[in-house]
Curated annotation (Swiss-Prot):
Chain positions recorded as carbamoyl phosphate binding sites: 58-59, 108, 136, 139, 265-266
HAMAP family: Asp_carb_tr
PROSITE patterns per the UniProt record, alphabetical: CARBAMOYLTRANSFERASE
Pathway: Pyrimidine metabolism; UMP biosynthesis via de novo pathway; (S)-dihydroorotate from bicarbonate: step 2/3
Enzyme class: transferase
Organism from which the protein derives: Natranaerobius thermophilus (strain ATCC BAA-1301 / DSM 18059 / JW/NM-WN-LF)
Residue stretches spanning the membrane: none
Residues where L-aspartate binds: 86, 169, 224
MF terms in GO: amino acid binding; aspartate carbamoyltransferase activity
Protein name per its UniProtKB record: Aspartate carbamoyltransferase catalytic subunit
Amino acid sequence: MGLQRKSLLGLKDMEKSEIESILDSTESMKEIVQRKNKKLPTLKGFSMVNLFYEPSTRTRSSFEMAGKYLGADTTNMSASASSVAKGENLIDTGKTLEAMGINLIVMRHPLAGAPRLLANNLSCSIINAGDGYHEHPTQALLDMFTIKEYKGSLKGLKVTIIGDIYHSRVARSNIWGLTKMGADVRLAGPPTLLDQRVFTEMGASCYYRVEDALADADVVMALRIQRERQGKTLLPSLREYARLYGINQERFKLAKKDALLLHPGPVNRGIELTSELMNSEKSVIEEQVTNGVAIRMALLYHLSGGEDNGDIA
């Protein structure tokens, strides 16, 4: 079963079967990423634009690579170097791109709901590459794929997410996705960065002591402290955060012996994670980056109607 939609705006409203379809397709895409000749004609004639209103290295680059590996015409566009800087509004920008024949827009925006606004006003496909605090669905999908690769299944796993939960669109998408797949999601962070009421209603368990959340975990995911989104009163200091919530090898021992360590990046070394732990065999952070290209290839394939055209390779 393919995706029953033309756009990917979030995982909250995505069916479990759709997530499974994407994860299954990603296995084939990863084989393509890892081989010497990566170029395919699958999306020849398909045009996509990466429209980013916020800085990005991993997400934008991986979408660009994903499109190029499948043969799509891919263009990167930053808000600061476009008519947006002259005051053009979002819908007008989208309509301009659509008038040029663009088939798909990948968009990152600081305001929650911006991708949905665009999707409601355009006929081309939209992929949400992160909107405010709301969602970052492709990051959660690549996280789930990475976990599934190592653990075989997501069902019944205890997944602990630690850090700046309040400002994290990655955490929100992971909660929606992982709980749909049957995982037990635990959250840990300072009280100022973890609203128990909101996240409990989403299906996660909340802890203020990181040690309690780490106990017997199958997967540990650290999140970046988003200093650009915070007021100065939310954390006493980064040193204090590292002391209470930073993950080091001693704390990591509270998780299961075969526990995995994930981080969406970029990492503030010595704050969220120690370099020693990040460089250990527990870490699958580099694998997440590889899988990010593969998961985005799978999404482009599905949203372009690629499954109607036969085999990938």
